A protein has these predicted regions:
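C-terminal regions of RecA-like/P-loop NTPase motor modules
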Residues: 68-85, 101, 119-124, 137-250
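Signature of the SF2 helicase/ATPase Hel1-core->accessory helical subdomain module
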Residues: 94, 133-136
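Charged helix-capping and loop-helix junction motifs
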Residues: 107-115, 152-155
């Protein structure tokens, strides 16, 4: 979805992923953009894809653990140097709790964090996307097939406060232990909340989410029937060396 917005709308992103190395995030973005494994790219393609990633994404190093206020401060510094359309925090649950001298509890701290992110988003016209884990109880819930079902919005760690503050809320669910290989490749996209439905968006039916199917190379997604890709991969013109004019020697 992040690569989709960058390719279709030229969005510029700031990404903090505490569970993935910076190089790994960049490599995955390169592969999604090109719809090709890095190992299958030519040197010129790798160079151009890396340049494209550098131009669209600022990746925050995960050598340190940051609080939500650290992320906002970093965003403000980046925005003074370049335009930013969105930030992705993966996951919010990994951010450290910085409650020294605040005199508030954990519940109020997280509500304050959600409010601060919302205020920052509105004030700067920047989309703030927080990736969050579900509570343990939701992970135990099984469907008729014996596999975990998609958690509800209120199953998010921290409860309904994040649902209440968010403009949009989505749940992405995969059945990675399904016996059917095709089902393993599916990602269910449940739109749980859309605040402004007047602009055209709306929640998905409870039992009828959008379904995206990962391709065989794990470098892109199509619709459930595999008929249409989410976006066309970017292409670069191979640079060719100009022929050397040796006529002056004759």
């Amino acid at each position: 979805l992040i690569a989709n917005s960058a390719i279709r709308h030229d969005w510029k992103w700031v990404i903090y992923s505490s569970e993935n190395r910076t190089a790994s995030v960049k490599m995955q973005l390169m592969q999604f953009a090109m719809d090709k494994k890095v190992a299958d790219m030519t040197y010129a393609e790798r160079k151009q894809a890396y340049k494209w990633v550098q131009g669209h994404f600022t990746i925050i190093n995960n050598n340190q653990i940051y609080s939500y206020s650290d992320i906002i401060l970093f965003m403000e510094k980046v925005m003074r140097q370049q335009p930013v359309d969105a930030i992705f925090v993966d996951p919010y649950n990994s951010l450290k709790l910085d409650m020294k001298g605040s005199g508030i509890g954990v519940h109020d701290y997280h509500y304050e964090a959600a409010s601060e992110f919302l205020t920052f988003s509105k004030a700067n016209d920047v989309a703030v996307w927080l990736n969050m884990h579900a509570v343990t109880e939701a992970q135990r819930r099984k469907g008729p097939d014996g596999l975990p079902v998609a958690p509800y919005a209120e199953d998010t760690e921290g409860g309904g406060k994040f649902v209440n503050r968010a403009d949009c809320f989505m749940t992405i669910h995969r059945k990675v232990q399904a016996m059917d290989h095709d089902i393993r490749k599916l990602s269910e996209l449940h739109v749980r909340k859309v605040r402004e439905v007047e602009t055209g968006g709306s929640p998905t039916p409870l039992e009828d989410p959008y379904c995206l199917q990962m391709n065989l190379s794990h470098t892109g997604f199509t619709n459930r029937l595999g008929q249409r890709a989410m976006f066309k991969p970017i292409t670069f013109k191979e640079s060719t060396q100009m022929p050397i004019n040796m006529s002056f020697l004759s």
